[in-house]
Amino acid sequence: LKCHKLVPPVWKTCPEGKNLCYKMFMVSTSTVPVKRGCIDVCPKDSALVKYVCCSTDKCN
């Protein structure tokens, strides 16, 4: 699986076990992603951050 890093079109190949791509947003400004990459489990939302995940190449 290949996931975008913080700024597309830069991407990286995910390590084994982290087979989801994610975008992380601050809940207060949920329009601009603050982080992108590979993640093992989703969703992982909290009071401050929201994760949007997917399982196909470069879909974040």
Swiss-Prot record:
Gene Ontology terms describing biological process:
killing of cells of another organism
Q: Name one GO molecular function term.
A: toxin activity
Question: What UniProt keywords are attached to this protein's entry?
Answer: Cardiotoxin, Cytolysis, Disulfide bond, Membrane, Secreted, Target cell membrane, Target membrane, Toxin
Location of the protein in the cell? Secreted; Target cell membrane
Q: Which SUPFAM superfamilies match?
A: Snake toxin-like (SSF57302)
One Gene Ontology CC term in the entry: other organism cell membrane
Stated name of the protein:
Cytotoxin 1
Organism for this UniProt entry: Naja nivea (Cape cobra)
Taxonomic placement:
Eukaryota, Metazoa, Chordata, Craniata, Vertebrata
